[in-house]
Amino acid sequence: MYQTTAELRSAFLEFFRSNGHQVVDSSSLVPGNDPTLLFTNAGMNQFKDVFLGMDKRNYTRATTAQRCVRAGGKHNDLDNVGYTARHHTFFEMLGNFSFGDYFKEEAIRFGWTFLTETLKLPKERLCVTIYQTDDEAFEIWNKKIGVAAENIIRIGDNKGAAYASDNFWQMGDTGPCGPCSEIFYDHGDHIWGGRPGSPEEDGDRFIEIWNIVFMQYNRQASGEMLPLPKPSVDTGMGIERIAAIMQGVHSNYEIDIFRTLIAKAAEIIGVSDLTEKSLRVIADHIRSCAFLIADGVMPSNEGRGYVLRRIIRRAVRHGNKLGATEAFFYKLVPSLIAVMGDAAKGLAETQAIVEKALKAEEEQFARTLERGLGILDAALNELKGDTLDGETVFKLYDTYGFPMDLTADVCRERNIIVDEAGFEVAMAEQRSRAQAAGNFGADYNAALKIDAETAFSGYTELAGQAKVTAIYQNGESVTAIKAGDEAVVVLDVTPFYAESGGQVGDKGQLVANGVEFTVNDTQKYGQATGHQGVLATGNLSVGQVVEAKVDKKLRHRTQLNHSVTHLLHAALRQVLGTHVSQKGSLVDPERLRFDFSHFEGVKATELKEVEELVNTQIRRNHELKTAEMGIDEAKEKGAMALFGEKYDSQVRVVTMGDFSIELCGGTHVGRTGDIGLFKITSEAGIAAGVRRIEAVTGAAAMAYVAQQQAELEEAAALLKGDANSVVAKLKAQLDKMKQLEKEMAQLKDKLAAAASADLVGDAVVVNGVNVLIKKLDGVEASSLRGLQDELKQKLKSAIIVLGTAQEGKVNLIAGVSNDLIGKVKAGELVAMVAAQVGGKGGGRPDMAQAGGSQPENLDAALAQVLPWITERLA
């Protein structure tokens, strides 16, 4: 009997392999070249183009165990995860597919045979649904399989429109579609619920375990259903559901995978009650988060990365709720790999990266989690009614990194509704503000619409004749311009590269007899290329022929920087890991800027390795080869694509030896040796999960190295040595400085002790207690604590308040001897004073410190101390 999830997966794939199906690996959770999908959410996703007739495989039968994620976008189960028996962010879909091979009878027979003979499920526990008018399916189930008529349930259009039914599948408004048949399992009458199609169908007694889709129509825009020439089959069975049945449990969270993960999470956090819903949330979320990172998604503030961030933060919040006091989530990865078996092969290969990324995100969120939860808790405690306003939800999102669904999760536990509409309004207002700021000083050309087309000749030439097809001035089409006029000139063909893919637009001239138009920038306007600039001499009109001449030096320097970004991208992936992907770039003649996904700062040793690797590839002088090919062929060759971009069916591929292959429309050097030298000038984080490297190449890199050498020699001269001795001499100077600082601190302690003897005489007695309140001039804040300790020793039973004002800041300290903390607490005392000087602070009952920003109020604040103490000592 197949019991474990791993055994069920193997049994399913082996059953269909033995029945002529090609076992195909699970595709990535990031759908390839399909921007309509946020994540892979069904087994058929990777075969979409096959079903549409746009792709052909060397097999007509396939079977998979597909990893899927449903969180964010149309298919979003996140809010329900942990609170129901069957909702998950991550699940595995077992499926078998026919591409114009077998159809209804074979598909139905395969499903029934696997369930009743391989898994030996009792037939009397199974019932099936079919589409209302699918008599063919009824005959197969009833006459050929032997399912009783009363156990075959017809489902009509139950979603308010023709063919809108639980039993009619559609890829979209048009395209392949058809009826489907679902197999249900009866958990028994001890669980509430009715058969599908009944008023009680939403109960948990009858659970759908397998959906068999018969793609037999091609839906037209008119709504007409035309028969497909080669009908196909798409099926799906959630492995978690069938595992629950085979393991004799009702909830998916009770199967082997989840039992293991829940137990491990409880052990790490220190929880004994394994029924906690928060443990379910954590166990579910580690699966989606770990596999998403393994497939190249990194936490960020946009797109797929933001969905990942939301899931991680929801898990961390539930861990916090259970009492977790340190990073715990990443520690579940080894257990996940172990329990997922063969399905975790890719995850095992990227385990170190996955753990680091999870830990970094968890630690980052932990810095704001407690404070954010405190603000949310206070808002909920003060709430009048049952709805939390959108402004508060937005503040938590904007300031403390709380995704709205995390706030909603907390509110749900207290039966509070979230004002989602108000949150969206606040979000829209922020977007408007950001857009307004971004548009400040925007050029009128940004909104220019040009209905023309320009051919690009700049891959092979930097000059050539062209005809002026349009001229735009101040956003309006004109027929001619005169000397001194600024304009956008459109040509029928141009060697000028228009800004795209991070590469800046070319500069140069358009010249003719007595005419010179200086091109300061080149931009794309739809299919047209616009040459932005000013007419230096002569008159220029539409229809005129000009010589288009690109500035060769600037283009050459830009090409050096563009080509090296490809080498840099490949080197980063080799040194840091294959999770690295390009997030943006800027390539101009002076420098390059490359943004990439990574969860932590790049170490100096790693940067050095990256730089050396790039320079090695430069010295190898690879020839740069470009080729036009189909997108699928390019991806099969391993071409890197910008994450989530939509590409045309034909793409341009740039290859540099066996080191780099990318999709790119930019201009490049002929050989990597042309780059000369690559030098990184800076590396920094620009957003959560996004790093930026700035660098220079060629002559600019040589100049940078020369400047560094000059500065090194200048430093050596200041240290009275040479370049080779700078480090040793600097270390000696730092050691000497530390010793001087130590001696200075000792001297300050002695001075404080001497000063304390003078200050003792300033103490007054209040109800038998020594009270010393003093504003000190010329005393550094770092000396206050030592001085307070000395005064306590001398005064024995005492209350002390000292304050200094330096450089626009106030520093305060309060000390209370142990015999008096029952009446006066140092934390309360110093907080009272700090509030009057624009500050805050606190500490222990016997000693507390504070700061402030209003030194002009210090005298008045200290004057309030004696009455405050007197009142408490009365």
From Swiss-Prot:
Key words, A-Z: Aminoacyl-tRNA synthetase, ATP-binding, Cytoplasm, Ligase, Metal-binding, Nucleotide-binding, Protein biosynthesis, RNA-binding, tRNA-binding, Zinc
InterPro entries, per the entry: aa-tRNA-synth_II/BPL/LPL, Ala-tRNA-lgiase_IIc, Ala-tRNA-ligase_IIc_anticod-bd, Ala-tRNA-synth_IIc_core, Ala-tRNA-synth_IIc_N, Ala-tRNA_ligase, Ala_tRNA_ligase_euk/bac, DHHA1_dom
Entries under SUPFAM superfamilies matching the protein: Class II aaRS and biotin synthetases, Putative anticodon-binding domain of alanyl-tRNA synthetase (AlaRS), ThrRS/AlaRS common domain, Translation proteins
Pfam families assigned to the protein according to its UniProt record, in alphabetical order: DHHA1 (PF02272), tRNA-synt_2c (PF01411), tRNA_SAD (PF07973)
Biological process annotations from GO: alanyl-tRNA aminoacylation; negative regulation of DNA-templated transcription
SMART domains listed in its UniProt record: tRNA_SAD
PROSITE patterns, sorted: AA_TRNA_LIGASE_II_ALA
Substrates-to-products reaction catalysed: tRNA(Ala) + L-alanine + ATP = L-alanyl-tRNA(Ala) + AMP + diphosphate
EC code: 6.1.1.7
Co-factor binding details: Binds 1 zinc ion per subunit.
Alphabetized GO MF terms: alanine-tRNA ligase activity; aminoacyl-tRNA deacylase activity; ATP binding; tRNA binding; zinc ion binding
Top-rank taxon: Bacteria
Entry's free-text remark on domains: Consists of three domains; the N-terminal catalytic domain, the editing domain and the C-terminal C-Ala domain. The editing domain removes incorrectly charged amino acids, while the C-Ala domain, along with tRNA(Ala), serves as a bridge to cooperatively bring together the editing and aminoacylation centers thus stimulating deacylation of misacylated tRNAs.
Task performed by this protein: Catalyzes the attachment of alanine to tRNA(Ala) in a two-step reaction: alanine is first activated by ATP to form Ala-AMP and then transferred to the acceptor end of tRNA(Ala). Also edits incorrectly charged Ser-tRNA(Ala) and Gly-tRNA(Ala) via its editing domain.
Entries under PANTHER family matching the protein: ALANINE--TRNA LIGASE, CYTOPLASMIC, ALANYL-TRNA SYNTHETASE
Name of the protein this chain belongs to: Alanine--tRNA ligase
This protein's encoding gene: alaS
